[in-house]
Amino acid sequence: MAAVNIIKKRTKPFKRHQSDRFKRVGESWRKPRGIDSCVRRRFRGTISMPKIGYGNNKKTRYCMPNGLKAFLVRNVSDVELLLMHNKTYAAEIAGNVSARKRVEIVEKARALGVKVTNAGAKVRSQE
């Protein structure tokens, strides 16, 4: 079976109607429900609404450009969960993990053959 290319149908975020005009209207998407709304009635030239057709392929959904899915790791025992799934998932070390624990996690991942996406983050070289 041939590998499926990762194609994102839309990378631009859906913004709320008139969020660029008024400060009080936030950017996070809300469905327009007004009776005269041009966006709800899908007039030409208005912003597009999220719909099922923008969904990505199920096989490549949540995939990073390298083809792996990110798995959040908080301790060394979490890395061992990826031992059987190292071709599907890549470890991503959580932001609240200390530098000392990060070194242990990266060493364990290297021994198990698990890819770490942010291996160099918060780790200083010995001077």
Swiss-Prot record:
Keywords: Cytoplasm, Nucleus, Phosphoprotein, Ribonucleoprotein, Ribosomal protein. PROSITE patterns: RIBOSOMAL_L32E. Its main location: cytoplasm. The keyword Phosphoprotein applies. GO terms for molecular function: structural constituent of ribosome. GO terms for cellular component: cytosol; cytosolic large ribosomal subunit; nucleus; preribosome. PANTHER family: 60S RIBOSOMAL PROTEIN L32 AND DNA-DIRECTED RNA POLYMERASE II, SUBUNIT N (PTHR23413), RIBOSOMAL PROTEIN L32 (PTHR23413:SF1). Component of the large ribosomal subunit (LSU). Mature yeast ribosomes consist of a small (40S) and a large (60S) subunit. The 40S small subunit contains 1 molecule of ribosomal RNA (18S rRNA) and at least 33 different proteins. The large 60S subunit contains 3 rRNA molecules (25S, 5.8S and 5S rRNA) and at least 46 different proteins. There are 2 genes for eL32 in S.pombe. Belongs to the eukaryotic ribosomal protein eL32 family. Component of the ribosome, a large ribonucleoprotein complex responsible for the synthesis of proteins in the cell. The small ribosomal subunit (SSU) binds messenger RNAs (mRNAs) and translates the encoded message by selecting cognate aminoacyl-transfer RNA (tRNA) molecules. The large subunit (LSU) contains the ribosomal catalytic site termed the peptidyl transferase center (PTC), which catalyzes the formation of peptide bonds, thereby polymerizing the amino acids delivered by tRNAs into a polypeptide chain. This is Large ribosomal subunit protein eL32A.
